[in-house]
C-alpha cells in the first residue's frame, strides 16, 4: 500500500482498531447517516484530507479516547480527557475541547474520521490472513500475464505490420486519467467493491473458490470474448458508488488502460493470421462470428449452471459438516457431564446421609435443652412471684402522709396482682388457637377480678370529690383493661396483640400512681385516719351530687360541744361542704364571678322541696350561672328523694312539726369550734342575757353583751334546751290567739336550723384548711388578714364594751359570737347576719339589756328621757329581731315598759342595712295592739295591724337582703338580723330596759305578710348564683347576735330581687300564702311596712360601689362626719375594686350603710334621738310625723333601695321595689319608708351600731400590718357623730338623685342618646355585663362538653357579640361628649379591646353584624379542639374587658360625684 511508507504498522493497527470501535459505535447507536451531500461534511472531510498521516493518527487517537471516555461506565471518570505529559500542550488543550462538543457534533466528527479512515485504507486488518480470492484480481492478473505473453510473442509482428491505432489513445487516456485515478485507489476500489456486494453472494463465491480452486482457470479473460470482458469491467465500474472518489495510485491499473489492452489483445490474433485465413474469414465473417458467439454463450451458460450447482452442493456439505461437528461436541460434553455428575452425586449422598443423622441427633438434644430452659424459667418466675414486694421506708416517707387515705397493704396487693397478671400474659404462646386464648382469658379475668375488688376497696378509702379526677381515671383504666382482656380472650393473640393488654394494665398502674400521689399513703402509725376518712366519706354523701369541686379530705379538730341529744353537729360536713362548689359545669368560674360566688346565698327551691337546677344555660343575672359552694350548701334542702341530704337533724317535736312547713332550710356551715350562745328566755318581764361565745383556735371567749340577769356560764346545750322550751311555751295556748295563730301558721325552726345557720360561718381551719389546694382563691392572704383583724376587733370590743359602745348597742364580734366564724365572703357574712342574726331573740331580754346599757351621758345630750332612749333602742332591735318568740314576747314594747304597737315594727335591709326599722312607737306610750303602722306600697295600702296586745306586739320588719329574704320565715320567726345594722339594732334591743315586757316580740316582716292576710307576695329573691326565686326560710329559734361590718352589704345577682312576687310565686315557694303571715290581719294592717316599689333593678357589677351614707341623721349633724363618711365610702370602693367578693374588707369599714327613711323634716327630729352608729336606721320624719297617733295613724313609708343594695320585695304587700342601680356590694343608699309611727310622736331614730365600725378606730392602732385600705370610723366621739349627721343630711339631699337611679330601666335606655349621664351608662353597662358573664359561663360549660356542636357555640357567641356591640356603642357615644373627658382617657383602649374581641369572635364563628346567625354546614359537626380553645380565649378576654369597662365608667362617674360633693362642701 502507498501509506505503508508514512505510517508504521503499529499505527496502522491502532487506526484499524479505532475504525472498528467507531464503526461498532455507530452500529450500536444507529447514529450513522449519509452526510455526503452535506456541505459542512464536505468541508470537514476536505480538511481531514489535508492532514498528514501522523496528524491524522493523532486526531483519530484523540477522538477514539474521547469516545471511550463518553461511553465509559466508570462514575469516577473525569469530565474531560486528562492531559498527558508526553503530549504537546496544544494537543492536550485540543483533547480537552473535545469534551465540550455536543453529542451531535461529536457524532459528525466520528463519521468524518470513519470516512477518512476508509479513504486512507486503514480499515483493513494487517494481522488477518488475506482472503485467497478476490476473483477479479486473479482474473486480471492472469489476464495481464496472458496479455504480456501475447504482446511479447506478437511484438514483432505488431511492429512489423503497422502502428497500432489504439496505442495513441491508450497513451493519451492514461495521461488524462492519471489526473483522477491512481493504481492504488483502484486496488482500494476493488477491495471496497467486495463489501458492497451482497454478503451471501460474496460468501458463496469465496466458498466456491476455496472448495474448488481448479475451476478458477475455467473462467478466465482469455476464454471470454473481449466484449464480455469489457462489459464486465464497465459493469464493475458502474457498481462502484459514484459518490466515492477512487484514487488509483498506479496508472496501469486504470480500467481504461485495461480496455485498451483488451482491444489490443483481440486485434493481435487477427493480425497474426495468414492472409489466406483472413480471406476465408472475410468471406464468411458474419457466420463465424455468430457461431462463436453462440458457442461461447452456451458454454458460458453451462458454466454458470455448473457453478451454481456446485455452490449449492458446497453450501449443503459445509452445513452438514458443521452440524456433525456440533453434535459430536455436544455428545462429548454430555459424556463428561455424566461422569462428573455421577461422582458428585455419590459424594453428596454420602455427606447428606451423615448430616441427616447429625441433624436428628442435634434436634433431639435441642428439644431437650429447650424443655429444660422452659422448666427453669417457669421455676424462676414462680420463685419471683412468691417473693412479695415490700414497700420500703423511703417509699413510705415519700408518698405517705399523716392525712393519707390509701392503706399501704392495698398497694402491695395490687402490685402483686399486676405482676401475676403480666407474668401470665407473657406466657401466652403466639398462636391462633382459640381454645388456648379462652383458657388464658379465664385466668387473666380471675386475676383482674381480684385486682378490681382491691381497687374498689381502695376507692372506698380515697373516693373523695377532691380526688374525683384521679378516681375517674382509675375506674376508666380498669374498665379499659377488662375490655382488652375480653377481646383478647375472644379473638386471641393473632388479632389482639399482647401489647394491647399490657398497655391497658399499664394504664391501671399509672392511674393508681396518680391517686397515690394525690391521696397519699396512710402510714401504719396513723390508725385513726381510717375512721376519720370513713366519716368524711359519709359526709360526702350529703354533698350535692353535682358538686365538682374537690372536697378537702382533712378537717380541723373540733372541740367537743355538748349539743342536745339528736342534734347532729354539722361542723365537719360544713367545714368541707363549704368548699364544695355546686355546679353542674366543671368549667372554672371566671374570676369576675368568683367575687359573687363566695357569697352564701340560699338557693331557691321548688314547692316540693327539691332544689331547682343549680344553673341555667344562660341566665338573666350576671352571676346566675355561677353558684358558690356556700350557696350550694346554704340553699340545698332535704329533698323527697334524698338527693340533697341535709346534715342537720331535727331535734324537737316542735322543730319537726315546723319543718313540714319549711319550704327551704338552708344548709349552712358551722365553725367547728364555735359554741352557740343561746338566750335563755326568762319570765315575762325578765330580760334574758344573750351571750354569744366563740371558741376559735385560740379558744377565745367573750361575752358580747353585758350579762345582766342570766348565768353567763350556762352551757350551750342548756341554753338550747331552755330556748326551745321557751319557744314551745310561746306557742302554748296561753299566748295571744293571734300570736298563736301566727306560730301555727309559720314553720318552726329548731336546732336543726340553728346549726344550719351556724354552718354559714366557717372556721379558719374548716373553711381554709385546704384552701392551699384551691388555685382559684387569689385572696387567701387578704382573707386571713381580715380574719385576724376581725378577731382583734372582737377582743377590743369586749374590752371596751361599756366605755366605747352606746348603751343601747350590743356588740358582737365575728369571732366572739358562737356563730361568728371566718366569713369567707360578703355573702357568707350576709348569710350569717341573715340567718344567725335573725335567730330568735327573746324580746324581753333585749329591751332590758338595752335599758341597762344606755349611757347616761348620751341621754342628757339627746335631751330625751330614759324611756325615749329605750324606745330608740327598742326600735333598733325591733328592726333586727324577728322570731315567733319575739313576736310573742315583744308584743307591746312600750318603751316605758309598755307594749309597743306593731308600728314599732322596723324594716331592715341587710346588705345595705337599707331596711328601715319601722318607727317604733317611741312616745313612751303603750302601743295598743291596735296601734297601726301602715305599710304602704303602690300595690298595698293595707295597714298591718298589730297583733292582739296580750302583751305582744309584732313589729314587722321586712328584711331586704338576699339572705334576709330567704331567712325570713313564716310568722313564727324571730326578726332576722340580716346585716350589721340589723345586728346593731338587735343589740340595741337589749339596751331597752326592763320596761319592755318579755312577752313583747319584735317581728320582722315575714315574707308572706301582705295586707291583712298578707298571703300575696312572698318575699322572693334570687340568689347570686341562681336566677330562681328564693323563699324565705324560718330562722332558728336561737338568737345569735353578730355585729358584722358592712361587708354584709354585698349582695348577689341583680336579679336577686324579683319584682313583686305574686301569690303564685308564694305557692311555688311552698309557703302557704295566708299561713305564712307573720302578722295577724290586725297586725298586718297596723304594721308600718313601707311600700317597696315593685320594679327592682339591682346594679350588680364586679366593681366596688362607693358606699353612700344613706341613713337619715337627726338635726344635730356634723358636716365633718359626712365628709369623713364620704371618704370612707370612697376608700371602701377603691379597696373593693381590687378585692374579690370573698374579701371581707367590708367587715372592717362599715361606713355609709344607712337606712334612710323617706322624706325627713329635720326640724321634727329631736336632738336626743341622734343615732350612734353609721349604720343607722332612721325613721323618716313622715314616719315620725304621725307617730303621735298611738292609735294607728298610718304613714306611708317608701323604701328607697339605694344604688348599691338589692331591693327586696316586701312580702307583706304587693310592694313595688324600685329598680336601683345595683352592684355586687350592696352599699346601701337610703331606704326611704314613708312610715308613720302611730303610737308615738317620738321621732324614732334608730341607730344600729356596727361592731366593725366601733372597733375600726382601734383597728387602726393595733393592726398596722393589716391592709391599710381598711379605714375605720371610731363611733365613740361626738364629733364623729356630728360628722355623720352632716353626711346624712347630704345624703338626704341626694335622695331624689338616688331615687332616679332606682327607677333605671335597662330596656328603656337609649344607647344613641348623647345626653346619657355616666351614672345611667354605668347602670346600663352593669346590666349588660350580667348577661355577658352569664352567657360566657354557659359558653364555657358548653365548650367543656365533648359532644357540643359548632352551631351551639356559634349561637352563644352571637349572643355575646351582640351585647358587647351595644356596650361598645353606648360607651363610645358617651366618650365623645366633652364633659366625659375622664372616661375617654382610660375608656378608649378598653372599648378598642372589646371591639377587637368582637371582631375576633365574628371571624372565628362566622357571625354577621346584624345579629342574624346564618346557618353553616358545619353547625352539626362537633367543635374541634382548636375552635374551642380559641373561642374560650376570646370569651375570657371579653369577660376581662367588660369588667374593666364597667370599672372605668364607674371611676369616671365617681370622679364626677366627688367633684360634685366637693362643690357642695365648699
UniProtKB/Swiss-Prot annotation:
Its main location: other. Gene3D superfamilies: Nucleotidyltransferases domain 2. Residues 150-163, 526-536, 705-716, 1050-1066, 1107-1123, 1211-1238 have a biased composition (Polar residues). Residues 543-559, 831-848 have a biased composition (Low complexity). Residues 140-149, 191-212, 261-270, 693-704, 718-747, 816-830, 973-987, 1171-1181, 1193-1206, 1276-1287 have a biased composition (Basic and acidic residues). Residues 761-781, 1288-1312 have a biased composition (Acidic residues). Pfam families: GIT1_C (PF12205), GIT_SHD (PF08518). The modification Phosphothreonine is found at residues 220, 1179, 1251. Residues 818-1087 are annotated as: 25 X 9 AA approximate tandem repeats. Residues 123-163, 181-223, 261-290, 522-562, 676-782, 816-915, 954-1086, 1098-1130, 1171-1246, 1276-1312 are annotated as: Disordered. GO terms for molecular function: MAP-kinase scaffold activity. InterPro entries: GIT1_C, GIT_SHD, Spa2/Sph1. One of its GO terms (cellular component) is polarisome. Sequence repeats lie at residues 818-825, 826-834, 835-843, 860-868, 875-883, 884-892, 893-901, 902-910, 911-919, 920-928, 929-937, 938-946, 947-953, 954-961, 962-970, 971-979, 980-988, 989-997, 998-1006, 1007-1015, 1036-1044, 1045-1053, 1054-1062, 1072-1080, 1081-1087. The modification Phosphoserine is found at residues 182-183, 254, 274, 301, 585, 599, 646, 817, 820, 865, 883, 910, 937, 961, 979, 1053, 1056, 1080, 1173, 1180, 1263. Residues 286-388, 1169-1189, 1275-1302 form a coiled coil. Keywords: Cell shape, Coiled coil, Phosphoprotein, Repeat. The keyword Mitochondrion does not apply. It is found in: Cell tip. One of its GO terms (biological process) is regulation of cell shape. Interacts with SHS1. Present with 274 molecules/cell in log phase SD medium. Involved in pheromone-induced morphogenesis and efficient mating, perhaps as a cytoskeletal protein. This is Protein SPA2. It comes from Saccharomyces cerevisiae (strain ATCC 204508 / S288c). The gene is SPA2.
Amino acid at each position: 500500500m502507498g501509506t505503508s511508507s508514512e505510517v508504521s504498522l503499529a499505527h496502522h493497527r491502532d487506526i484499524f482498531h479505532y475504525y472498528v470501535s467507531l464503526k461498532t459505535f455507530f452500529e450500536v447507536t444507529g447514529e450513522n447517516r449519509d452526510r455526503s451531500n452535506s456541505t459542512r461534511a464536505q468541508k470537514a472531510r476536505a480538511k481531514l484530507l489535508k492532514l498528514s498521516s501522523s496528524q491524522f493518527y493523532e486526531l483519530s487517537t484523540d477522538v477514539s479516547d474521547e469516545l471511550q471516555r463518553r461511553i465509559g461506565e466508570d462514575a469516577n471518570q473525569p469530565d474531560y480527557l486528562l492531559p498527558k505529559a508526553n503530549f504537546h500542550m496544544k494537543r492536550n488543550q485540543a483533547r480537552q475541547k473535545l469534551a465540550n462538543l455536543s453529542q451531535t457534533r461529536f457524532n459528525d466528527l466520528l463519521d468524518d474520521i470513519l470516512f477518512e479512515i476508509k479513504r486512507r485504507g486503514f480499515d483493513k486488518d494487517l494481522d488477518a490472513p488475506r482472503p485467497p480470492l478476490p476473483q477479479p484480481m486473479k482474473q486480471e492478473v492472469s489476464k495481464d500475464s496472458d496479455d504480456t505473453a501475447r504482446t511479447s510473442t506478437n511484438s514483432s509482428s505488431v511492429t512489423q505490420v503497422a502502428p497500432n491505432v489504439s496505442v495513441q489513445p491508450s497513451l493519451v487516456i492514461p495521461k488524462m486519467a492519471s489526473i483522477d485515478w491512481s493504481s492504488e485507489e483502484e486496488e482500494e476500489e476493488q477491495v471496497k467493491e467486495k463489501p458492497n456486494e451482497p454478503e451471501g453472494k460474496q460468501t458463496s463465491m469465496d466458498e466456491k473458490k476455496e472448495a474448488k480452486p481448479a475451476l478458477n482457470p475455467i473462467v478466465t479473460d482469455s476464454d471470454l470474448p473481449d466484449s464480455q470482458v469489457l462489459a464486465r469491467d464497465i459493469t464493475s465500474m458502474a457498481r462502484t458508488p459514484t459518490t466515492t472518489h477512487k484514487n488509483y495510485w498506479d496508472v496501469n491499473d486504470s480500467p481504461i488502460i485495461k480496455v485498451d489492452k483488451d482491444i489490443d489483445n483481440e486485434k493481435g490474433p487477427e493480425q497474426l493470421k495468414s492472409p489466406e485465413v483472413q480471406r476465408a474469414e472475410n468471406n464468411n465473417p458474419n457466420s463465424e462470428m455468430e457461431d462463436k458467439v453462440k458457442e461461447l454463450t452456451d458454454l458460458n451458460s453451462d458454466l454458470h449452471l455448473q457453478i451454481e450447482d456446485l455452490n449449492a452442493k458446497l453450501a449443503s456439505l459445509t452445513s452438514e459438516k458443521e452440524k456433525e461437528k456440533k453434535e459430536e461436541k455436544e455428545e462429548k460434553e454430555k459424556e463428561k457431564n455424566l461422569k462428573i455428575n455421577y461422582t458428585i452425586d455419590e459424594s453428596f449422598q454420602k455427606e447428606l446421609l451423615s448430616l441427616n443423622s447429625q441433624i436428628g441427633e442435634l434436634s433431639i438434644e435441642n428439644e431437650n435443652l429447650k424443655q429444660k430452659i422452659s422448666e427453669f424459667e417457669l421455676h424462676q418466675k414462680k420463685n419471683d412471684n412468691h417473693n412479695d414486694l415490700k414497700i420500703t421506708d423511703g417509699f413510705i416517707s415519700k408518698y405517705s402522709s399523716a392525712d393519707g387515705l390509701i392503706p399501704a397493704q392495698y398497694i402491695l396487693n395490687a402490685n402483686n396482682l399486676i405482676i401475676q397478671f403480666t407474668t401470665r400474659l407473657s406466657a401466652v404462646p403466639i398462636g391462633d388457637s382459640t381454645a388456648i386464648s379462652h383458657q388464658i382469658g379465664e385466668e387473666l379475668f380471675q386475676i383482674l377480678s381480684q385486682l378490681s375488688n382491691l381497687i374498689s376497696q381502695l376507692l372506698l378509702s380515697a373516693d373523695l370529690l377532691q380526688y374525683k379526677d384521679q378516681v375517674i381515671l382509675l375506674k376508666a383504666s380498669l374498665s379499659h383493661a377488662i375490655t382488652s382482656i375480653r377481646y383478647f380472650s375472644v379473638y386471641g393473640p393473632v388479632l389482639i396483640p399482647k401489647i394491647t393488654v399490657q398497655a391497658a394494665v399499664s394504664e391501671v398502674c399509672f392511674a393508681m400512681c396518680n391517686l397515690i400521689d394525690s391521696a397519699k399513703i396512710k402510714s401504719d402509725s396513723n390508725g385513726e385516719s381510717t375512721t376519720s376518712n370513713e366519716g368524711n366519706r359519709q359526709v360526702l354523701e350529703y354533698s350535692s351530687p353535682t358538686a365538682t369541686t374537690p372536697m378537702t379530705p382533712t378537717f380541723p379538730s373540733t372541740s367537743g360541744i355538748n349539743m342536745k341529744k339528736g342534734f347532729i353537729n354539722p361542723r365537719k360536713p360544713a367545714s368541707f361542704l363549704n368548699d364544695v362548689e355546686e355546679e353542674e359545669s366543671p368549667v372554672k368560674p371566671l374570676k369576675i364571678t368568683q367575687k359573687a360566688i363566695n357569697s352564701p346565698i340560699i338557693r331557691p327551691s321548688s314547692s316540693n322541696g327539691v332544689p331547682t337546677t343549680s344553673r341555667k344555660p344562660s341566665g338573666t343575672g350576671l352571676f346566675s350561672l355561677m353558684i358558690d359552694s356556700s350557696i350550694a350548701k346554704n340553699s340545698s334542702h332535704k329533698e323527697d328523694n334524698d338527693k340533697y341530704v341535709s346534715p342537720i337533724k331535727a331535734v324537737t317535736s316542735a322543730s319537726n312539726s315546723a319543718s313540714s312547713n319549711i319550704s327551704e332550710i338552708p344548709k349552712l356551715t358551722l365553725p367547728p369550734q364555735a359554741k352557740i350562745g343561746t338566750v335563755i328566755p326568762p319570765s315575762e318581764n325578765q330580760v334574758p342575757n344573750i351571750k354569744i361565745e366563740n371558741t376559735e383556735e385560740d379558744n377565745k371567749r367573750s361575752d358580747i353583751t353585758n350579762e345582766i340577769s342570766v348565768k353567763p356560764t350556762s352551757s350551750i346545750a342548756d341554753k338550747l334546751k331552755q330556748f326551745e322550751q321557751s319557744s314551745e311555751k310561746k306557742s302554748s295556748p296561753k299566748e295571744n290567739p293571734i300570736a298563736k295563730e301566727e306560730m301555727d301558721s309559720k314553720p318552726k325552726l329548731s336546732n336543726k336550723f340553728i346549726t344550719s345557720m351556724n354552718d354559714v360561718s366557717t372556721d379558719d381551719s374548716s373553711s381554709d384548711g385546704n384552701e392551699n389546694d384551691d388555685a382559684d382563691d387569689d385572696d387567701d392572704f387578704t382573707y386571713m388578714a381580715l380574719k385576724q383583724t376581725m378577731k382583734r376587733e372582737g377582743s377590743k370590743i369586749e374590752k371596751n364594751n361599756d366605755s366605747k359602745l352606746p348603751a343601747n348597742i350590743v356588740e358582737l364580734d365575728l369571732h366572739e359570737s358562737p356563730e361568728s366564724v371566718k366569713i369567707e365572703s360578703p355573702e357568707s357574712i350576709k348569710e350569717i347576719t341573715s340567718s344567725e342574726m335573725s335567730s330568735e331573740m327573746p324580746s324581753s331580754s333585749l329591751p332590758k339589756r338595752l335599758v341597762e346599757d344606755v349611757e347616761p351621758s348620751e341621754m342628757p345630750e339627746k335631751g330625751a328621757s330614759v324611756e325615749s332612749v329605750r324606745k330608740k333602742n327598742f326600735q333598733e332591735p325591733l328592726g333586727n329581731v324577728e322570731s315567733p318568740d319575739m313576736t310573742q314576747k315583744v308584743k307591746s314594747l312600750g318603751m316605758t315598759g309598755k307594749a309597743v304597737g306593731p308600728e314599732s315594727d322596723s324594716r331592715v335591709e341587710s346588705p345595705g342595712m337599707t331596711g328601715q326599722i319601722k318607727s317604733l312607737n317611741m312616745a313612751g306610750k303603750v302601743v295598743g295592739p291596735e296601734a297601726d303602722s301602715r305599710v304602704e306600697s303602690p300595690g298595698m295600702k293595707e295597714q298591718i295591724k298589730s297583733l292582739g296586745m296580750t302583751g305582744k306586739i309584732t313589729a314587722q320588719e321586712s328584711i331586704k337582703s338576699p339572705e334576709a329574704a330567704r331567712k325570713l320565715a313564716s310568722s313564727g320567726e324571730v326578726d332576722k338580723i340580716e346585716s350589721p345594722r340589723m345586728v346593731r339594732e338587735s343589740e340595741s334591743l337589749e339596751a331597752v330596759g326592763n320596761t319592755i315586757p318579755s312577752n313583747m316580740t319584735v317581728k320582722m316582716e315575714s315574707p308572706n305578710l301582705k295586707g291583712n292576710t298578707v298571703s300575696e307576695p312572698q318575699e322572693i329573691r334570687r340568689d347570686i348564683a341562681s336566677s330562681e326565686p328564693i323563699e324565705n326560710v324560718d330562722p332558728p329559734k336561737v338568737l345569735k347576735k353578730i355585729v358584722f361590718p358592712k361587708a354584709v352589704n354585698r349582695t348577689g345577682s341583680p336579679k336577686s330581687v324579683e319584682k313583686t312576687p305574686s301569690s303564685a310565686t308564694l305557692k311555688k315557694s311552698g309557703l302557704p300564702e295566708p299561713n305564712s303571715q307573720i302578722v295577724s290581719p290586725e297586725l298586718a294592717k297596723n304594721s308600718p311596712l313601707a311600700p317597696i316599689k315593685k320594679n327592682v333593678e339591682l346594679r350588680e357589677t364586679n366593681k366596688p360601689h362607693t358606699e353612700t351614707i344613706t341613713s337619715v341623721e337627726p338635726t344635730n349633724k356634723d358636716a365633718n362626719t359626712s365628709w369623713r363618711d364620704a371618704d370612707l365610702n370612697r376608700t371602701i370602693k377603691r379597696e373593693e375594686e381590687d378585692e374579690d367578693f370573698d374579701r371581707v374588707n367590708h367587715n372592717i369599714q362599715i361606713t355609709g350603710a344607712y337606712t334612710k327613711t323617706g322624706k325627713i323634716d329635720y326640724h321634727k327630729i329631736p336632738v336626743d334621738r341622734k343615732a350612734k352608729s353609721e349604720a343607722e336606721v332612721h325613721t323618716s320624719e313622715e314616719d315620725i310625723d304621725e307617730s303621735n297617733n298611738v292609735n294607728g295613724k298610718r304613714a306611708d313609708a317608701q323604701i328607697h333601695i339605694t344604688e348599691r343594695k338589692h331591693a327586696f320585695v316586701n312580702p307583706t304587700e304587693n310592694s313595688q321595689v324600685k329598680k336601683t342601680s345595683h352592684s355586687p356590694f350592696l352599699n346601701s343608699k337610703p331606704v326611704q319608708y314613708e312610715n308613720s309611727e302611730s303610737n308615738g310622736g317620738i321621732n324614732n331614730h334608730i341607730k344600729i351600731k356596727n361592731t366593725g365600725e366601733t372597733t375600726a378606730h382601734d383597728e387602726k392602732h393595733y393592726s398596722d400590718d393589716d391592709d391599710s385600705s381598711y379605714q375605720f370610723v371610731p363611733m365613740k366621739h361626738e364629733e364623729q357623730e356630728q360628722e355623720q349627721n352632716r353626711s346624712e343630711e347630704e345624703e338626704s339631699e341626694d335622695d331624689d338623685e338616688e331615687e332616679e337611679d332606682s327607677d333605671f330601666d335597662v330596656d328603656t335606655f337609649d344607647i344613641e342618646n348623647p345626653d346619657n349621664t355616666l351614672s345611667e351608662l354605668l347602670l346600663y353597662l352593669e346590666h349588660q355585663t350580667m348577661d355577658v358573664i352569664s352567657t360566657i359561663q354557659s359558653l364555657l360549660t358548653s365548650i367543656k362538653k365533648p359532644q357540643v356542636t359548632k352551631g351551639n357555640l356559634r349561637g352563644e357567641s352571637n349572643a355575646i357579640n351582640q351585647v358587647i356591640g351595644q356596650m361598645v356603642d353606648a360607651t363610645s357615644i358617651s366618650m365623645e361628649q366633652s364633659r366625659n373627658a375622664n372616661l375617654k382617657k382610660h375608656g378608649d383602649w378598653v372599648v378598642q379591646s372589646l371591639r377587637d374581641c368582637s371582631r375576633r369572635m365574628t371571624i372565628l364563628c362566622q357571625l354577621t353584624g346584624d345579629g342574624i346567625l346564618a346557618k353553616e354546614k358545619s353547625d352539626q359537626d362537633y367543635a374541634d379542639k382548636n375552635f374551642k380553645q380559641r373561642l374560650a380565649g376570646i370569651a375570657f378576654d371579653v369577660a376581662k374587658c367588660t369588667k374593666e369597662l364597667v370599672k372605668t365608667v364607674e371611676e369616671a362617674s365617681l370622679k364626677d360625684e366627688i367633684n360634685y360633693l366637693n362643690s357642695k362642701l365648699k
